[in-house]
């Protein structure tokens, strides 16, 4: 009997990670539909998976960045500048797509919802100020709280100082980085079970009924994200590399977007992205920095969410939106999106900042935020999938473009 069970399990264990995750998704959907009570009880699997990813991500980023900079050889190229440029362009283009879609497919909201809790930031200047202050947070607190801006700042500083250290010291840092990476690979092997628990619990708990009332709004948001993922991002990559972008696009969607969709956290998906970059053969010195940095500032999905819901609120209140204001909204959404990294549903709390451009009161804006939380089961998942997969996509594009230039 045991050998028969082993014969059934062995093919599953020998499958690749993506087929295993696909099976986990299907099993989670079936369990939620057939036995919803049981589905809620397996949520522990999903919680354990997300907790493990969030726990290992800060120390992984710290070790990888420190090791990459400490062992960086003078004259050895990195491609961070190109990645940063792509991050900025991608986020701004996503905001423009969202604004255009909102004009073509205008939506309205039913603003009769209870107040929701949250402390939206007071303005763009405050967001930038908080971003700078977070960079000088106590390093121990940064590791405990998952503050990746501070982690990056301290890791870069320590790595630069260790360049003057002994070879043995740098080798210890490198070995520590490899050891933590091994733990991450072990955690990722449990992704199919974790996603099975997340899917089953989400569908059993929320269902699809809550999504139907705001189907048009959700369709515009998700449609914009799909358009960015499948049209504008590939176009940006093509213009940067002059190569067919779609093999790389689909590799990033398979390897990063699926897990990000269910973890709903760019920070939790950092280990997955680092593993994917390694499989794609990218420059470790580049992706060790660009991936955690992208989880903080590359927020195309958040820019889309903020823009679409803000314009829906303006339409509901009958506020006319002219072209200069729409253009300003694109810029504000892009900058504001940088302040929501690693927070499930964080982009929704930036909506009051954007609605203030149209003179919408905070009370009404927070009701709009409440609508965002209703659709967040799909919106936040899709947003994170776009954000996280784009981190790898633009990192790969910058690395490959640089390789072509260097070989020419």
Curated annotation (Swiss-Prot):
<dbReference type="GO" id="GO:0005295">
    <property type="term" value="F:neutral L-amino acid:sodium symporter activity"/>
</dbReference>
<comment type="function">
    <text>Involved in the import of serine and threonine into the cell, with the concomitant import of sodium (symport system).</text>
</comment>
<feature type="transmembrane region" description="Helical">
    <location>
        <begin position="218"/>
        <end position="238"/>
    </location>
</feature>
<keyword id="KW-1133">Transmembrane helix</keyword>
<keyword id="KW-0029">Amino-acid transport</keyword>
<dbReference type="Pfam" id="PF00375">
    <property type="entry name" value="SDF"/>
</dbReference>
<feature type="transmembrane region" description="Helical">
    <location>
        <begin position="362"/>
        <end position="382"/>
    </location>
</feature>
<protein>
    <recommendedName>
        <fullName>Serine/threonine transporter SstT</fullName>
    </recommendedName>
</protein>
<dbReference type="InterPro" id="IPR023025">
    <property type="entry name" value="Ser_Thr_transp_SstT"/>
</dbReference>
<feature type="transmembrane region" description="Helical">
    <location>
        <begin position="49"/>
        <end position="69"/>
    </location>
</feature>
<feature type="transmembrane region" description="Helical">
    <location>
        <begin position="192"/>
        <end position="212"/>
    </location>
</feature>
<keyword id="KW-0472">Membrane</keyword>
<feature type="transmembrane region" description="Helical">
    <location>
        <begin position="15"/>
        <end position="35"/>
    </location>
</feature>
<dbReference type="GO" id="GO:0032329">
    <property type="term" value="P:serine transport"/>
</dbReference>
<dbReference type="GO" id="GO:0015826">
    <property type="term" value="P:threonine transport"/>
</dbReference>
<dbReference type="InterPro" id="IPR036458">
    <property type="entry name" value="Na:dicarbo_symporter_sf"/>
</dbReference>
<dbReference type="GO" id="GO:0005886">
    <property type="term" value="C:plasma membrane"/>
</dbReference>
<feature type="transmembrane region" description="Helical">
    <location>
        <begin position="289"/>
        <end position="309"/>
    </location>
</feature>
<feature type="transmembrane region" description="Helical">
    <location>
        <begin position="142"/>
        <end position="162"/>
    </location>
</feature>
<keyword id="KW-0997">Cell inner membrane</keyword>
<feature type="transmembrane region" description="Helical">
    <location>
        <begin position="85"/>
        <end position="105"/>
    </location>
</feature>
<feature type="transmembrane region" description="Helical">
    <location>
        <begin position="317"/>
        <end position="337"/>
    </location>
</feature>
<dbReference type="InterPro" id="IPR001991">
    <property type="entry name" value="Na-dicarboxylate_symporter"/>
</dbReference>
<feature type="transmembrane region" description="Helical">
    <location>
        <begin position="246"/>
        <end position="268"/>
    </location>
</feature>
<keyword id="KW-0769">Symport</keyword>
<keyword id="KW-1003">Cell membrane</keyword>
<keyword id="KW-0813">Transport</keyword>
<keyword id="KW-0812">Transmembrane</keyword>
<comment type="similarity">
    <text>Belongs to the dicarboxylate/amino acid:cation symporter (DAACS) (TC 2.A.23) family.</text>
</comment>
